[in-house]
Amino acid sequence: PYRGTELDPPFTKPDLVLTGTDGKQFGLREETAGKTTLVFFGYTNCPDVCPTTMGDISAALSKQSAAVRDNVRVVFVTTDPERDTPKSLGKWLAAFGENFTGMSGDLEQVKKAALSLGISVEDPKKHHDGTVTSDHGAQVAAFLPADDKAHVVYTAGTTSDDYARDLPLLAKS
C-alpha cells in the first residue's frame, strides 16, 4: 500500500545513542519508541539530496492532520559530526519543523547504525579547494509505531506527494 519499498523482513531500529540537538544524550530507540519515525543519514552542508529530502518530508507533514503530525518523528543522523555540532544541526533542522531532530557524535557508530539498515556512509572527504563532502546513501527508513521496525524505505526522488500519501498509513500502522 506504500509508495516506498516494503521491507521483508523489516529492519530493527539501531541501538544508536549520540548527542541530540539539545546537547543531551539521545537514544534513537528510547526517544522514538511507539512513534512513526523516519530516519535519514546525511549532513547539513550537503549540496543536494539532504535539504531536498528534508524539505519534501516537511512539506508532506504540513499537509497532515494534527493526529498524524503528533505521531511522526524525523531523525536526521549527521554523517559529518565534525562540522554538524548539535547546535548547528538543531538550527538547520528547525527550519523544517518541530517534528525534526538530529543526532551527532561518533562517526563509527553512525556508520554501523546506517549499515544495519543497508545504508552506506563514508568518511567525509576534504578537497583541495577546502570543501568537504560526505558520501552517504539517500534512503529514508520508516519505522512503524506498532513494533518500532523499519517496514518501508524511501529512495532519493521520493516526492512530497508520495510522503504525504504514505504518512497517514505509516502513523496508524
Question: What are the language-model segments listed below?
Answer:
Residues V17-T21, K125, A142-F143:
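Hydrophobic beta-strand positions
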Residues L28-I57:
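Short active-site neighborhood of thiol/selenol oxidoreductases, capturing the structured segment around
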Residues G90-G137:
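Short, internal strand/loop/helix patches
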Residues K35-T36, T52-F76, A94:
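Conserved helix-turn-beta segment immediately C-terminal to the redox Cys motif
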Residues R69-D84, F100-V110:
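Thiol-based oxidoreductase modules, predominantly thioredoxin-like and allied folds used
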Residues H127-S173:
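Thiol-/selenol-based redox modules, centered on thioredoxin-like
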Residues F11-K13, A33-T36, R69-V72, D84, ...:
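Extracytoplasmic
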Residues P1-E30:
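N-terminal "domain-start" segment that seeds a small globular fold
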